[in-house]
Amino acid sequence: MYQWIQRDSDVHQRWIWCRRLLIVSLVSALMSVLQVIVFRFVDPPLSMTMVGRYLEAWSDRQWNFRLHYVWCDLEQIAPSVPISLVAAEDQRFPFHHGFDFDAIKNALGRHSRGGHLRGASTISQQVAKNLFLWSGRSFVRKGLEGWYTFWIELFWPKRRILEIYANIAEFGDGVYGVQAAARRYLGKGAADLDESDAAQLAAVLPSPRHYNIQHPGPYIRWRSSWIQRQAKQLGGSAYLDMH
């Protein structure tokens, strides 16, 4: 009799914990969706990438570290910038729904042939990662990135995705957004950037802390020219206006 009672008690405790876990999971899911909805209308004061950079600096005792981040509406950014970002990072941005399966397939194909496995993240995925998640590589983070990307594409227009991307992308150590980068490295505002300037900013995005916008090396000069050619082939800023 005692064993039956104990067994029923164990089953009851398990059910309580399962129910609590389910409630926590549902609340977390709803909160994440609410985050996405809020930032559809509210400009983010910081991103998780910026928070992570602050923590990294403090852990290294860099007490004087400062972020350079100035929000700039897309209307106040030169038309050359969005198309340069798309040409550099995600040329199918107007057409996909957050995931570029062709790019993923091509990346895996190159890797299977012995090439380096390059990322195939879309601009939408990069926004999800930079705005809401931590740095690093893990299946958990990648899964959450996919979750946030789905809701971003559902609730945000492409224009809003590109606007937030242009503002939270890192262009140098502690320098976030086109406006801050333009002022710090090029001595002008985001509204005054020409095609060459925009391509030069976009060229460092694979490794913004490794490359220098003010003193570009051969690779950045080559990549900047390539981005300008790609932007023209896509049709310039009209490529984004049409979609």
UniProtKB/Swiss-Prot annotation:
Native species: Xylella fastidiosa (strain M12)
Location in the cell: Cell inner membrane
Protein EC: 2.4.99.28
Protein's name in the database: Biosynthetic peptidoglycan transglycosylase
Cited function: Peptidoglycan polymerase that catalyzes glycan chain elongation from lipid-linked precursors.
Similarity section: Belongs to the glycosyltransferase 51 family.
UniProtKB keywords: Cell inner membrane, Cell membrane, Cell shape, Cell wall biogenesis/degradation, Glycosyltransferase, Membrane, Peptidoglycan synthesis, Transferase, Transmembrane, Transmembrane helix
MF-aspect GO terms: pentosyltransferase activity; peptidoglycan glycosyltransferase activity
Annotated catalysed reactions: [GlcNAc-(1->4)-Mur2Ac(oyl-L-Ala-gamma-D-Glu-L-Lys-D-Ala-D-Ala)](n)-di-trans,octa-cis-undecaprenyl diphosphate + beta-D-GlcNAc-(1->4)-Mur2Ac(oyl-L-Ala-gamma-D-Glu-L-Lys-D-Ala-D-Ala)-di-trans,octa-cis-undecaprenyl diphosphate = [GlcNAc-(1->4)-Mur2Ac(oyl-L-Ala-gamma-D-Glu-L-Lys-D-Ala-D-Ala)](n+1)-di-trans,octa-cis-undecaprenyl diphosphate + di-trans,octa-cis-undecaprenyl diphosphate + H(+)
